[in-house]
């Protein structure tokens, strides 16, 4: 079983239709028969196995579809309706916004995926080395991270044409 928000990252899902793409599967020599069943994040995808329920001393509870990491984070933060979003900065950096329809934005290389909430999508930009990049700069300059962050003025406007794309870590945005 695969859940929609996680399946969207496989590139085999027709994200707008929330179904496997026969065209993309065929392009990679696969068929629907080789793919898992698709469920929404809130759908029951199975039941806890009897042996595990017995071992853990709990009933055979339903198991929900769940969600991909960022979609599940969004649900936990209440980012489930259009116009809501979050910014997460850690080892990776994510800018996530819930949307009411499939609205790809390939011109800006922003991902458009299914949300873990039925009939909802999300757009996100991701870089897998957000705070790691600051740590790297701190190490090579010998300056503490707070000191480097203090160099950025409070009234920063539009992004500068100068860019930084760390080559040692994967970047999902702006290259998709």
Task: Name each region found by the language model.
Residues 33-38, 59-63:
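Short active-site oxyanion
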Residues 40-48, 67:
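Glycine-rich phosphate-binding loops at beta-strand->alpha-helix junctions
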Residues 1-2, 6-27, 50-176:
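Active-site core segments that coordinate phosphate-bearing ligands/cofactors
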């Amino acid at each position: 079983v695969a859940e929609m928000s996680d399946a969207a990252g496989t590139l085999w899902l027709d994200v707008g239709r929330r179904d496997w793409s026969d065209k993309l599967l065929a392009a990679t020599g696969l068929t629907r028969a080789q793919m898992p069943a698709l469920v929404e994040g809130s759908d029951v995808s199975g039941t806890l196995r009897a042996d595990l329920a017995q071992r853990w001393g709990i009933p055979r509870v339903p198991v929900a579809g769940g969600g991909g990491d960022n979609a599940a984070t969004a649900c936990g933060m209440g980012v489930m309706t259009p116009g809501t979003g979050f910014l997460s900065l850690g080892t990776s950096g994510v800018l996530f916004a819930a949307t009411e329809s499939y609205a790809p934005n390939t011109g800006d290389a922003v991902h458009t995926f299914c949300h873990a909430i039925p009939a909802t999508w999300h757009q996100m930009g991701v870089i897998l080395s957000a705070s790691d990049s600051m740590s790297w700069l701190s190490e090579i300059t010998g300056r503490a991270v707070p000191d480097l962050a203090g160099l950025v003025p409070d009234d920063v406007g539009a992004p500068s044409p100068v860019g930084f794309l760390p080559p040692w870590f994967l970047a999902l945005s702006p290259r998709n």
